[in-house]
Amino acid sequence: MKIIKSLILLVLFMASPAKGDDFAWMSSGLSGLKSIFGCLEVPTFTSFQEGKIGISLSTAGDWQSTGNAVEKGKLLKIKWSTAGLTPEPRKYLVLYRIDPRFSVPQVFIKTYNYKNSQFEVAGFPGFSTANDGVIPPDKNLDALSFTKMNNYVNYFNYANGNPKIQVNVGDIVNISLADKDDFFNPSTSKTPSTLNNILAKELDSSVFAASALYTESNLGNFENRIVYSSAEQVCNIIDAQRATLCTGTGSATKYTNVSNGALVGKPMAVTTLQNFMSMINSCPANSNLNANPSCYYDQGRGMVIKIGGQVIKNRDQSFVNNDNTQNGFMYYQATSGGAMDFSSDWQPTGMFNNSFSMSDWSRNFSNYTDFATYITNGNWATNFLYFGRYAMIVEIGNGTNTISPGDQKNITLEYLITADGTLPSSSTPGTTVGYDFSGDAPQDGYLWLRVKNPNSNIQGTISVDYANYTGTTWFSNIVYNGAIKPITDQFRTYSEDFYFKLVANSAIQNIAKTALTLYVTIFGLMFVLGALKLTAVEVVTRIFKITIVAILLRPESWSFFNNNFFSAFINGIDFFATNVVGATSSKSNIFGFIDPIFDKYTNGRIWGLLFIQLLQIHNGLAFIVIITIYSLITYFRAVLEVIIGYVIAFIGLTVMISLAPFFIILMLFEKTKTMFNNWISILFSYVVQPTILLIFFLLIDQILSEQLLKVIVRACWDTLIPIKIGLDLSNLGIPLNFSFTLPFLPGIPFFVPQVPDITSSNILTNDTNTFLVLFTTALLFYSYCLMSYGLVSFVTIVVGMLTQVTPARIEGNYQAPSNPTESIMKDIGSVAAPIKKAALAPARIFKDKVIDQNYEARKPQGGGEHTGKFFQNRNDVKPEQTERND
């Protein structure tokens, strides 16, 4: 009775409680109580708290909250993927500039850093000082640059590792002219961390220095132009009388550069050059040096672009004009891969009468004084003018839209657990995890995640799935930490101690030495007599056997064999068991998988609903519940078998390892080698058996979880037992027969299972919990539980067939394989028999005194009465009459 009261209280506690300040339920009728208690829904198994978060690479380095609270020592799983990432177009800022001191056009390249949102430059052959950004007072720009001339030449010839823009097959290349009048404008950062401040001053200096680098061409508002014209045509426009800027006439005309700016690609002052550019027009197609009148080239003309040596734009080809930005562009899909090259077939050769090549200067002048004298005294009048520049934005997109393996490898995910929910600083270190991480939480707290991405050209969102165990761990802690681990640790120690005693035993030592001597002697005699064919494999095999037995005799043999051989079996059991388990409470506890199972099958809501169904004796639900409960008890016994099977396998493994010295010696001779092979097979069988047993067990558990939820049905507050008072006086000759219900107590209220009646619409479907579906599901649940209970015997046979190890047999029953687990379970059953009988005693009394007792009832016809027992004779009919009827 106490048990029944406890179950009723449990069910009532699971119902929706009334509010503390609402006393309306006290005056409610039975129908009103239904809205208060509501319904008990079938629970879902949620031993894990799961979540999903998308982390944008734009927030890389910042911690993101998951909202999950984790517990120390319990499982934490994190699984993430880079499937949602795509590469940003590789973006470059390219400055193509004509400088007659170089045999090829100057090409400055900046790479766009998406993380910093700016173009950044690296690799320029600048110079540094003790105070970067400040030119020393005893030095001038020309003197500082003089020592770097050879580096400049190598830089533009790509001889010092200066990388070109790389293009892969299938890449989409988009080149557009940029509205930039300065290679170092504010949006591209003049002082990136990879470049000295002084370099920016060097490239932008307005001071003439023949040895310095420049990015300006003094084009002013006329950017993205190239001028390639004879001195005669230029002078005819700016100095037709040859009064100040020019000398000579006809083909002998020379442009006299007073400031020597033409030598560095700046032939005129800004105002003069802008005035000149305003007086000339764009060159017609196929113009050349002697175009008359002088003109300029625009829209990319005068420049040749190649990819991997293949020309994608020739010199006279124009970019397509963009009506929106008025800047030209070109679009190309690469059919071949390689480096992108910007060049021209126009050469500055013959522009000056003196030597103007920086490569010649770096070879011919060993000191700055001689060089400065040469520049000062030289005649730098030009025979033609060739100057100008193009600023371009180059974007290269991946045709397959996938990130490279290298970029993918650089992206990492970290997790952090904090004691409170305060946002951690970005400088707080985290723990890096792989794509499928599984481990125990190092502490209690809240889970945070962040992405670290050193690749600035990758965009998108990383999808992260995470889960942590929230159920109890008491069972696995008791079973593993309290019982199994002490046993396995002791047997590890016993195995090592017994091994040492065997190896140190003089008798074993003598046997091993004698066996080695006989083996070598017999081998030598057979070889001398020609009875043995020696092959390389045979020689290696025999040397290997001798070496192994020789190591066995050494004091450090345990360390050698344990580290290289035994540990594979000892650790193999735990390794395979841990890796085949999916849901577990703890990664460090190999029996953690039992905790989610016990959380499922000991759920209070489940047992409360089972008790509610148990009260439904009149419609047969009680029979279904009895089958379910008995099935669960059978399943719990199967869990115990799995645990015992693991312990026995581990003990058997340690015992076999402790006997290793005997069996290792036996591998020398063919007659005894079979015993050694059988020993190896037994070791494998002890490793494989728990693994296969777990796999089968967990598969069945998945099915059982689904079936159990189908056996249990939703229960709502209703009338459990209707109370109807009836009066029938017809037997007394009074024609009075009526019945009525009490208005204040129409029945005994309680939770009632919601089982629909079988109809023509649901008789052939199993999506509704009709009585037919519940009964068949209960039988299936019972069948699966019986299947799990017989797993140990089945797996023993399977492992025996795999490893060729014959299972041990019971004495007197040599045709039936047995296993120690079955014997242990029988012993446990015999010990628990008295407890089982005592527990069933109340049930027997209930059956004898209540179910089987005589009871009176009105005979359906004729008014007779009868009493009887179930499956017994009727008491209202005499035995003689029964025999006569038969």
From Swiss-Prot:
- Segments passing through the bilayer: 520-540, 609-629, 647-667, 680-700, 779-799
Q: Pfam family example for this protein?
A: TrbL
Q: Name one GO biological process term.
A: protein secretion by the type IV secretion system
Q: Which UniProt keywords apply?
A: Cell membrane, Membrane, Signal, Transmembrane, Transmembrane helix
**Gene Ontology cellular component terms for the protein in this record:** plasma membrane
Any idea where this protein resides? Cell membrane
Where does it mainly reside?
Answer: membrane
Which interval of the chain is the signal sequence? 1-20
- Give me the stretches of Basic and acidic residues compositional bias: 875-886
Q: How does it sit in the membrane?
A: Multi-pass membrane protein
Question: What residue spans carry the region label Disordered?
Answer: 856-886
Q: Which family does it belong to?
A: Belongs to the TrbL/VirB6 family.
Give the protein name, as stated in the record: Uncharacterized protein RBE_1262
Q: Give the organism, scientific name.
A: Rickettsia bellii (strain RML369-C)
